[in-house]
């Protein structure tokens, strides 16, 4: 493996921040991979909840875009991208829409915690550019995603999921199906 050359554009970009960005890239790609797994689980003929599938596919694409945005930042700041292996999702069988939404909520909270730690590191290293980048592109979006998933979990539970298959079918049709009109 060749060693990375020194960047001529690097300024006020700490090595710890560079390493943390690379870890965040991996986490965002992992989240994308998990959502992709969820999407194609709900697309199976024996599950057949197409709006759950669409919802999670959209989330997968969004997480991949987050990783790409961080990669672009890494290059702009003069850092070097070092990709790691992406861990396999913990599940292959997501069991139910409720279980998948609960797992997604847990995942988004983990991503958010990692972003908060990255922001703290940027603050500690006196890197206002990285702080601004995270505040502008990530932190508020994470809070919104966590709230949306929390609402979905609450509504699925209120409807009697996962015991009631009808609950998940109706949620798929009327809640996630409606999201097509809002996007």
UniProtKB/Swiss-Prot annotation:
<dbReference type="InterPro" id="IPR008331">
    <property type="entry name" value="Ferritin_DPS_dom"/>
</dbReference>
<comment type="similarity">
    <text>Belongs to the ferritin family.</text>
</comment>
<dbReference type="GO" id="GO:0008198">
    <property type="term" value="F:ferrous iron binding"/>
</dbReference>
<feature type="domain" description="Ferritin-like diiron">
    <location>
        <begin position="11"/>
        <end position="160"/>
    </location>
</feature>
<feature type="modified residue" description="Phosphoserine">
    <location>
        <position position="183"/>
    </location>
</feature>
<dbReference type="InterPro" id="IPR009078">
    <property type="entry name" value="Ferritin-like_SF"/>
</dbReference>
<keyword id="KW-0560">Oxidoreductase</keyword>
<keyword id="KW-0458">Lysosome</keyword>
<feature type="binding site">
    <location>
        <position position="66"/>
    </location>
    <ligand>
        <name>Fe cation 1</name>
    </ligand>
</feature>
<dbReference type="Pfam" id="PF00210">
    <property type="entry name" value="Ferritin"/>
</dbReference>
<keyword id="KW-0408">Iron</keyword>
<dbReference type="GO" id="GO:0006826">
    <property type="term" value="P:iron ion transport"/>
</dbReference>
<feature type="binding site">
    <location>
        <position position="63"/>
    </location>
    <ligand>
        <name>Fe cation 2</name>
    </ligand>
</feature>
<protein>
    <recommendedName>
        <fullName>Ferritin heavy chain</fullName>
        <ecNumber>1.16.3.1</ecNumber>
    </recommendedName>
</protein>
<dbReference type="InterPro" id="IPR009040">
    <property type="entry name" value="Ferritin-like_diiron"/>
</dbReference>
<feature type="binding site">
    <location>
        <position position="28"/>
    </location>
    <ligand>
        <name>Fe cation 1</name>
    </ligand>
</feature>
<dbReference type="GO" id="GO:0005764">
    <property type="term" value="C:lysosome"/>
</dbReference>
<keyword id="KW-0007">Acetylation</keyword>
<keyword id="KW-0479">Metal-binding</keyword>
<feature type="binding site">
    <location>
        <position position="108"/>
    </location>
    <ligand>
        <name>Fe cation 2</name>
    </ligand>
</feature>
<dbReference type="GO" id="GO:0031410">
    <property type="term" value="C:cytoplasmic vesicle"/>
</dbReference>
<feature type="binding site">
    <location>
        <position position="63"/>
    </location>
    <ligand>
        <name>Fe cation 1</name>
    </ligand>
</feature>
<dbReference type="GO" id="GO:0110076">
    <property type="term" value="P:negative regulation of ferroptosis"/>
</dbReference>
<dbReference type="InterPro" id="IPR014034">
    <property type="entry name" value="Ferritin_CS"/>
</dbReference>
<feature type="modified residue" description="N-acetylthreonine; in Ferritin heavy chain, N-terminally processed">
    <location>
        <position position="2"/>
    </location>
</feature>
<feature type="modified residue" description="Phosphoserine">
    <location>
        <position position="179"/>
    </location>
</feature>
<dbReference type="InterPro" id="IPR001519">
    <property type="entry name" value="Ferritin"/>
</dbReference>
<keyword id="KW-0597">Phosphoprotein</keyword>
<dbReference type="GO" id="GO:0006879">
    <property type="term" value="P:intracellular iron ion homeostasis"/>
</dbReference>
<comment type="subunit">
    <text>Oligomer of 24 subunits. There are two types of subunits: L (light) chain and H (heavy) chain. The major chain can be light or heavy, depending on the species and tissue type. The functional molecule forms a roughly spherical shell with a diameter of 12 nm and contains a central cavity into which the insoluble mineral iron core is deposited. Interacts with NCOA4; NCOA4 promotes targeting of the iron-binding ferritin complex to autolysosomes following starvation or iron depletion.</text>
</comment>
<keyword id="KW-0963">Cytoplasm</keyword>
<dbReference type="GO" id="GO:0008199">
    <property type="term" value="F:ferric iron binding"/>
</dbReference>
<keyword id="KW-0968">Cytoplasmic vesicle</keyword>
<keyword id="KW-0409">Iron storage</keyword>
<dbReference type="InterPro" id="IPR012347">
    <property type="entry name" value="Ferritin-like"/>
</dbReference>
<feature type="binding site">
    <location>
        <position position="142"/>
    </location>
    <ligand>
        <name>Fe cation 2</name>
    </ligand>
</feature>
<feature type="modified residue" description="N-acetylmethionine">
    <location>
        <position position="1"/>
    </location>
</feature>
<comment type="function">
    <text>Stores iron in a soluble, non-toxic, readily available form. Important for iron homeostasis. Has ferroxidase activity. Iron is taken up in the ferrous form and deposited as ferric hydroxides after oxidation. Also plays a role in delivery of iron to cells. Mediates iron uptake in capsule cells of the developing kidney. Delivery to lysosomes is mediated by the cargo receptor NCOA4 for autophagic degradation and release of iron.</text>
</comment>
<dbReference type="GO" id="GO:0004322">
    <property type="term" value="F:ferroxidase activity"/>
</dbReference>
<dbReference type="GO" id="GO:0005776">
    <property type="term" value="C:autophagosome"/>
</dbReference>
């Amino acid at each position: 493996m060749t060693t990375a050359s020194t960047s001529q554009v690097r300024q006020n970009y700490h090595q710890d921040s560079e390493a943390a960005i690379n870890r965040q890239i991996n986490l965002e790609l992992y989240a994308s991979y998990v959502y992709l797994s969820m999407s194609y689980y709900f697309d199976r003929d024996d599950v057949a909840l197409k709006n759950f599938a669409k919802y999670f596919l959209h989330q997968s694409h969004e997480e991949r875009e987050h990783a790409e945005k961080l990669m672009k930042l890494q290059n702009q700041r003069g850092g070097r991208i070092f990709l790691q292996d992406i861990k396999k999702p913990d599940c292959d069988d997501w069991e139910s829409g409720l279980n998948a939404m609960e797992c997604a909520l847990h995942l988004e909270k983990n991503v958010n915690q990692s972003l908060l730690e990255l922001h703290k590191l940027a603050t500690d290293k006196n890197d206002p550019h990285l702080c601004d980048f995270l505040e502008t592109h990530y932190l508020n979006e994470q809070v919104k995603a966590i709230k949306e998933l929390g609402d979905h979990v609450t509504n699925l539970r209120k409807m009697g999921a996962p015991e009631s298959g009808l609950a998940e079918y109706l949620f798929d049709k009327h809640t996630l199906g409606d999201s097509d009109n809002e996007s």
